[in-house]
Design a protein with these regions (language model features):
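MPN/JAMM (Mov34/JAB) isopeptidase/deubiquitinase module and associated MPN-bearing subunits/adaptors
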Residues: 1-103, 107-245
Length: 245
């Protein structure tokens, strides 16, 4: 059954501005250090994980986003610090226990529009697909599903006028594209899921009969028709100027 990934209104500016800042603003390790732009950024999604119930699909609802400022950032990759992630998870668990770590987001910066289109830059890379299951297993091993967002960004030569829209084809349910001044952004959603099955090599003994069954675990990535990304405020904020006044 398709999983709904819901991004609440106040989370959207956190996602977009973190990608824009990493793309447009110079970053230095110190005042006289080398300046870098068009970097990837990485962050975490916090909120609620609602299971399948009465025919309603599983939902991952993001209500807060935090940026991993300790992550190593490059134009082609980003590497989060897992100690930082563990610290934040403990901090939320202590003071906001009602919120769970439900996923990640990171950006894909591109030089121009043609590069994005040629490479389908809004899609997850092979590295992303390998990283998400490992992240799921290491950080949130008992979560049934996690959401993962890719935010692609590029600059435009003039102010974009295209209204926000869903991605085309079989990616329609899982992503959006939007113009914001002299930049264009794509947001595409994925999920990683935990699967448990009986270990075929487990002995058929008294413990097995008593329900103490060894389970094998694996984590896989899902996309497109298996993911429904919902950002209700995106179309309203970017389509209707009245809401921005």
């Amino acid at each position: 059954m398709r999983t709904q990934v819901i991004i609440e209104d106040h989370v959207l500016p956190q996602l977009l501005t973190s990608a824009i800042e990493a793309y447009e603003v110079s970053h230095r390790a110190h005042a006289r250090g080398r300046s870098n732009k068009k970097l990837e950024t990485f962050g975490l999604l916090w909120g609620y994980a609602l299971p399948v119930r009465n025919g309603v699909p599983a939902r991952l609802v993001a209500v807060v986003a935090t940026v991993e400022t300790s992550a190593l950032r490059h134009t082609d990759w980003v590497r989060p610090d897992f100690e930082s992630i563990a610290m934040k998870r403990d901090f939320f668990g202590e003071y906001w226990p009602q919120l769970e770590l439900i996923g990640t987001f990171h950006s894909h910066p591109y030089e121009d529009l043609s590069e994005v289109n040629d490479t389908k830059g809004w899609r997850a890379s092979e590295g992303d697909r390998a990283f998400w299951p490992d992240f799921h297993e290491f950080v949130c091993p008992d979560m049934d599903e996690l959401a993962h967002l890719v935010i692609a960004i590029t600059g435009l030569s003039r102010k974009g006028t295209a209204e926000p829209d869903r991605l085309a084809g079989n990616e329609y349910t899982s992503g959006y594209v939007v113009s914001a001044d002299k930049r264009k952004l794509w947001i595409k959603g994925y999920t990683s899921a935990l699967y448990e099955e009986v270990d075929e090599d487990a002995p058929f003994d008294e413990a097995f009969m008593a329900g103490d069954i060894e389970m094998g675990r694996s984590y896989d990535v899902y996309e497109d028709e298996d993911v429904l990304l919902e950002i209700p405020s995106l179309e309203a904020r970017f389509r209707h100027e009245l809401l921005r006044r």
